[in-house]
Amino acid sequence: MNEADVTKFVNNARKTLTDAQLLCSSANLRIVDIKKKLSSWQLSISKLNFLIVGLRQQGKFLYTILKEGIGTKLIQKQWNQAVLVVLVDEMKYWQYEITSKVQRLDGIVNELSISEKDDTDPSKLGDYISRDNVNLLNDKLKEVPVIERQIENIKLQYENMVRKVNKELIDTKLTDVTQKFQSKFGIDNLMETNVAEQFSRELTDLEKDLAEIMNSLTQHFDKTLLLQDKKIDNDEREELFKVVQGDDKELFNIFKTLHEVIDDVNKTILNLGQFLQAKIKEKTELHSEVSEIINDFNRNLEYLLIFKDISNLIDSFKNSCTQDIQTTKELCEFYDNFEESYGNLVLEAKRRKDVANRMKTILKDCEKQLQNLDAQDQEERQNFIAENGTYLPETIWPGKIDDFSSLYTLNYNVKNP
């Protein structure tokens, strides 16, 4: 055993291991980098798939909102039925009611204002009422054609939007982008999936090959160090020398194999890189179509906001009409109460007139009784004077004995009610 040979073995093993470590480290870094790119691409495909699935659901949701929320509930039930039919009919009804009541009041003569001396036209009950809010509903009904035109315009926009969402967005763009995704990246394209998995398996196998080579070179280097340390007995050392000597002869072939493995690594990385580049380009193109679809959704959102603004305007008109209907109802009720109270007032005037007549009758009867009593009193006075006047001096009851003035004074007035 030559110690110079041992030293040579150690140096050869160290150099080979060091060179191999540099090559393997560089190769492993490239493998890690391309695997990261592969993982990133696979993750981006999953995200793109999630986005497309989400957009399809959003498309269905948008279509449901348009058909049921806007088409059925808003346009048909709220606008066409509740506003243009029910509300308009109610306004027409109450406008007719209040107009009829005003016309009725205009035709009722105020009996209390009639005078025999007055030859002018008598006043009517309609002269005593306020007419400020009589035509509230007529004014609102004049606005209905404008509302009808707005609803008709929004219906045309709605129908156009439904057609675009259903035909262009859902049936065409979303369906097309879904089919393209499935064709290029989905389960329908097993070849593409298998290619990516095959690249990944090849790289994993090459990593194992590199690890085995490095493990073999490391073990050989450890044996040379053990041989150099001389800590084993001569027989074992002699046997170890033969093993190391044989392995040293294989270093060239092992290093050659390492280069071949690294060449395979480089080829696989190159092929995988080209594959990813092509797939990323396809994904980018598909993502551009998805972005265009998202822009379509944003435009549809703006249209929905327009529907909301129009709905708010119509709701405001509806609420205003409802308030005017309530005002008109209250005014109709007031006119009814006014007419009823006028009727009661006529009865009250008649009652007062009857009372005045009764008072006049009573007073005339009283006056007649007083006159009779006064005549009787005059006769009694004359008889008294005739019998007693000669004997009574004037001073005994000054100014009274021969006073024939009436004992009563009656002055009354009954007002004409």
Swiss-Prot record:
A single Gene Ontology biological process assigned to it is: autophagy of mitochondrion
* KW Thylakoid (keyword) present: no
* Assigned GO CC terms: Atg1/ULK1 kinase complex; phagophore assembly site membrane
Which UniProt key words apply to this protein? Answer: Autophagy, Coiled coil, Cytoplasm, Membrane
- Which Pfam families does the protein's record reference? ATG17_like
Q: Name one GO molecular function term.
A: protein kinase activator activity
How does the UniProt record describe the way this protein sits in the membrane? Peripheral membrane protein
Q: Which residues form a coiled coil?
A: 146-221, 353-384
Cellular compartments annotated: Cytoplasm; Preautophagosomal structure membrane
Q: Which InterPro entries match?
A: Atg17 (IPR007240), ATG17-like_dom (IPR045326)
**Role, per record:** Autophagy-specific protein that functions with ATG13, ATG29, and CIS1/ATG31 in response to autophagy-inducing signals as a scaffold to recruit other ATG proteins to organize pre-autophagosomal structure (PAS) formation. Modulates the timing and magnitude of the autophagy response, such as the size of the sequestering vesicles, through interacting with and regulating ATG1 kinase activity. Plays particularly a role in pexophagy and nucleophagy. With ATG13, is required for ATG1 activation by autophosphorylation of 'Thr-226'. Recruits ATG9 to the pre-autophagosomal structure.
Q: How the protein assembles, per its UniProt entry?
A: Forms a complex with ATG13, ATG29 and CIS1/ATG31. The ATG17-ATG29-ATG31 complex interacts with the ATG1-ATG13 complex. Forms a complex with SNX4 and ATG20. Interacts with ATG11 and the conserved oligomeric Golgi (COG) complex subunits COG1, COG3 and COG4.
- Similarity section: Belongs to the ATG17 family.
Its protein name is Autophagy-related protein 17
Q: Which organism is it from?
A: Saccharomyces cerevisiae (strain YJM789)
Q: Which gene encodes it?
A: ATG17
